[in-house]
């Protein structure tokens, strides 16, 4: 569906040395999936996203969308290709002197729709995004979440195959963000639109995306199924993002002064619902103290992470046996200290 092949993007200021914003990126995005690109500010993710509709041209490499090399198009051919690619933005980009309905209708007029078909399509799409009762309101009368819904309505009005989302929730509060992500999931499921979403928040990736690419310094440092990236992050930068998202850092006081062994245990799938720690307490006679932990559900799969303290002052070998038992029953055990 979308093929990004060895894409580089360089920017030059005056006569200075070019700055490479995107560095040799290759990605394949399947039709109908929700694909996330995550990274910190300056990672190159927005620049990469803009190559998908040729708002930014690659300095090297190529971008194919629906079998067409969009990076090689211009003029009428490019305008026609862009009609199949919708885009929403962090700050909405609405026309403030036009009503909600007029904002949506504008994209249809620009695409050459027959006048008689515009009003019914506007009504249909506003119903889909939950704004049927706001058609005659102006943007200044809307909340941030409602403004983003207008942006989404405008972006999908032309029946696009692809929807590009540039930090769609970063200007919204947590509750409103969740409703916007739910709407995007609904649109993906109901209309089959391929969604490519960029964000700096792993929580957004976790809640909506099927697969993810992690960017740092203009490069894709890791990619894969969202669950796998959370469960087994390979690159140090990804590990940092996941750790920050799961928030499992122990205070230094606990790390240094608690007796016994400290373990970080990863539970995946069914093991997250099994009484593994109760088993080791009973079988090996060790004291188990849960210091930190949570269970996340990514899609329908459970991912549990616990930080625990194991002690057995009168039987030191019992702790080693308990650790080995935990290793056999769980996905991963990291000895933090001990």
Curated annotation (Swiss-Prot):
List ligand-binding residues for ATP: 39-46
Concerning its family, UniProt says: Belongs to the ABC transporter superfamily. Methionine importer (TC 3.A.1.24) family.
Q: What does this protein do?
A: Part of the ABC transporter complex MetNIQ involved in methionine import. Responsible for energy coupling to the transport system.
Q: Which organism is it from?
A: Salmonella paratyphi A (strain ATCC 9150 / SARB42)
Q: Which membrane topology term applies here?
A: Peripheral membrane protein
Q: What is this protein called?
A: Methionine import ATP-binding protein MetN 2
Domain ABC transporter: start-end pairs: 2-242
User: What molecular function terms (GO) are annotated for this protein?
Assistant: ABC-type D-methionine transporter activity; ATP binding; ATP hydrolysis activity
Signal peptide boundaries? none
CDD domains the UniProt entry points to:
ABC_MetN_methionine_transporter
Q: Which GO terms describe its cellular component?
A: plasma membrane
Q: What is its EC number?
A: 7.4.2.11
Looking at the record's lineage, which domain of life comes first? Answer: Bacteria
Please state where this protein is localized: Cell inner membrane
Q: Keywords on this record?
A: Amino-acid transport, ATP-binding, Cell inner membrane, Cell membrane, Membrane, Nucleotide-binding, Translocase, Transport
Catalysed reactions listed for this entry? L-methionine(out) + ATP + H2O = L-methionine(in) + ADP + phosphate + H(+); D-methionine(out) + ATP + H2O = D-methionine(in) + ADP + phosphate + H(+)
Keyword Transferase set for record:
no
User: Primary place of residence?
Assistant: membrane
Q: How does it assemble?
A: The complex is composed of two ATP-binding proteins (MetN), two transmembrane proteins (MetI) and a solute-binding protein (MetQ).
């Amino acid at each position: 569906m979308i093929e990004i092949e060895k894409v580089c993007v360089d920017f030059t200021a005056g006569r200075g040395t070019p700055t490479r914003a995107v560095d040799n990126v290759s990605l394949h995005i399947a039709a109908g999936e929700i694909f996330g690109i995550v990274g910190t500010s300056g990672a190159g993710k927005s620049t990469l996203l803009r190559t998908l509709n040729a708002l930014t041209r690659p300095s090297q490499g190529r971008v194919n969308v629906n079998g067409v090399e969009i990076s090689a198009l211009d003029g009428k051919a490019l305008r026609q290709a862009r009609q199949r690619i919708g885009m929403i933005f962090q700050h909405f980009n609405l026309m403030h002197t036009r009503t909600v309905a007029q904002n949506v209708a504008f994209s249809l007029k620009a695409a050459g729709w027959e006048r008689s078909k515009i009003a019914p399509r506007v009504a249909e799409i506003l119903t889909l995004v939950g704004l049927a009762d706001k058609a005659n309101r102006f943007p200044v009368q809307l909340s941030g979440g409602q403004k983003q819904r207008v942006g989404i309505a405008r972006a999908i009005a032309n029946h696009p195959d692809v929807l590009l989302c540039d930090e769609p929730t970063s200007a919204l509060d947590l509750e409103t963000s969740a409703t916007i992500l739910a709407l995007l999931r609904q649109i993906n499921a109901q209309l089959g639109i391929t969604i490519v979403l960029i964000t700096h928040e792993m929580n957004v990736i976790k809640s909506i995306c099927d697969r993810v690419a992690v960017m740092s310094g203009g490069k894709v440092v890791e990619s894969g199924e969202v669950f796998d990236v959370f469960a087994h992050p390979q690159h140090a930068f990804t590990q940092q993002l996941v750790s920050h998202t799961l928030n499992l850092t122990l205070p230094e006081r606990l790390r240094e002064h608690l007796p016994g062994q400290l373990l970080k245990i990863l539970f995946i799938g069914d093991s997250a619902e099994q009484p593994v720690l109760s088993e080791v307490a009973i079988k090996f006679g060790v004291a188990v103290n849960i210091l930190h932990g949570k269970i996340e559900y990514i899609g329908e799969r459970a991912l549990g992470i616990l930080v625990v303290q194991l002690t057995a002052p009168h039987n030191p070998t019992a702790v080693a046996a308990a650790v080995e038992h935990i290793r056999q029953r769980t996905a991963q055990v990291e000895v933090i200290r001990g």
